[in-house]
C-alpha cells in the first residue's frame, strides 16, 4: 500500500524545499552517494518501542478517562474522547509511514510521518498533558510525558534523516545528470569524428 501519486509528488516537493541543502553546488563523491544507507537506526528503534508503548498508553488513557468521566464538564468529555480517537487514528498512520519511509528510504512517506508528528500528534498530546481543566491523574501525566518524549525524539531524528535522504537523492540526481551529459558529449564527439573522416 503506497501513497497516491499526487500526495507523493507534493510531499517530495515539500521535502526537497525544506530539507535540501541549497548551499551545495554538486555531488560530494561519486561512489559513496550510490551505496550509502541513510536510514536512521535510532528513529527505527524509537518507532519500534513506540509501537509497543502505544497500546499501553491507549489502555491507560481509557481507564483514566473512565475513572474521571463523571467529574469532567460535558464539553471536556466530548473534547477528550475526540482527541483520543484522533490520536489513535493518526498514530496508526504515523507509525506505518515512519517505518516505510525510514526502512525503504522513501522521502514522501517519511515527510508525511514528520508532518503528522509535528503538526497533529504533538499538539494533541500536549493538549492532553498540559490542559488543567482535564484534571489529569498522576498516571496520565506520566504516560503523556513518556509519549511526548517519544514524539519529540522522533520529530528531531526524522528531520535529520530527511535532510540526509534529500541530500543523497540530490547527489544521485546530479551524478545521473553528469553521466548523461558526459555520455551525450562522447556520442557527439564520435559523430563529429566520423563526419570529419568522411
From Swiss-Prot:
This protein's GO CC annotations: ciliary membrane; ciliary transition zone; membrane; MKS complex
Glycosylated residues, chain numbering: 13
Superkingdom per UniProt: Eukaryota
Cellular localisation: Cell projection, Cilium membrane
Principal place of residence: membrane
Any one Gene Ontology BP term: smoothened signaling pathway
InterPro entries linked to this entry: Uncharacterised_TM-17 (IPR019184)
Record key words, sorted: Cell membrane, Cell projection, Cilium, Cilium biogenesis/degradation, Glycoprotein, Membrane, Transmembrane, Transmembrane helix
Similarity-based family: Belongs to the TMEM17 family.
Role this protein plays: Transmembrane component of the tectonic-like complex, a complex localized at the transition zone of primary cilia and acting as a barrier that prevents diffusion of transmembrane proteins between the cilia and plasma membranes. Required for ciliogenesis and sonic hedgehog/SHH signaling.
SUBUNIT field: Part of the tectonic-like complex (also named B9 complex).
Name of protein: Transmembrane protein 17
Organism from which the protein derives: Rattus norvegicus (Rat)
